[in-house]
Amino acid sequence: MAKLTKRAQMLREKVDTSKVYNLEDAVALLSEVSTVKFKESVEVSINLGVDPRKSDQVVRGATVMPNGTGKDARVAVFAQGAAADAAKEAGADVVGMEDLAEEVKKGNLDFDVVVAAPDAMRVVGQLGQILGPRGLMPNPKVGTVTPDVATAVKNAKAGQVRFRTDKNGIIHAAIGKVDFDASAIKGNLDALVGDLKRLKPSTSKGVYFKKITLSTTMGPGLTVDHSAYV
């Protein structure tokens, strides 16, 4: 049998994968077992009682994390005229139209979120094969195609997280950093759960929140008591 590394041995001793943790204990344990040299993100996986094979049960949207995510998002905006001015004033990192599209085509994608005014979609639509696979394509369902580009920029800068059920009906989202305290993580999780409740498909039957797991970028997954959300 291969010898366990010190980290693997430590995780085996401290983490009980069969246990359901309360949120405070889970956050404390994730911080305790984080041994990497960077501040790991705290990520949540929420198993929903939906059938993602049915188009009317795909859950997607965006949540502004009230306590931020610990990451300063870079925002690119496709807009012109007054909308472009509003985007710049709101703090957008890059604003443009055809010129910005040319940069994207060259592979210059130094941003985390893309916002577009409706009249800019004629330009953005040509970039689907580049932006789509990277999860950057603007979409009105998550508020990134909007005439109010300033608010979209402010939301992205404030820590807005976009989500969509994967093929197994699971939502994945970053809800903070490992140095966040439990109350900050809980506040962000509460906001996300609130939006998921609001977006529950009418055709979804039975238990909606089936399981919630917290993990860090490089750490173990801990099952969290989610009875308060049922």
From Swiss-Prot:
Domain of life: Bacteria
CDD domains linked: Ribosomal_L1
Gene Ontology biological process: regulation of translation; translation
Annotated keywords: Repressor, Ribonucleoprotein, Ribosomal protein, RNA-binding, rRNA-binding, Translation regulation, tRNA-binding
Cited InterPro entries: Ribosom_uL1_bac-type (IPR005878), Ribosomal_uL1 (IPR002143), Ribosomal_uL1-like (IPR023674), Ribosomal_uL1/biogenesis (IPR028364), Ribosomal_uL1_3-a/b-sand (IPR016095), Ribosomal_uL1_CS (IPR023673)
Any single Gene Ontology cellular-component annotation: cytosolic large ribosomal subunit
One term of GO molecular function: rRNA binding
Pfam family, one: Ribosomal_L1
Family label: Belongs to the universal ribosomal protein uL1 family.
Subunit structure: Part of the 50S ribosomal subunit.
Function: Binds directly to 23S rRNA. The L1 stalk is quite mobile in the ribosome, and is involved in E site tRNA release.
Name the record gives this protein: Large ribosomal subunit protein uL1
Species of origin: Chromohalobacter salexigens (strain ATCC BAA-138 / DSM 3043 / CIP 106854 / NCIMB 13768 / 1H11)
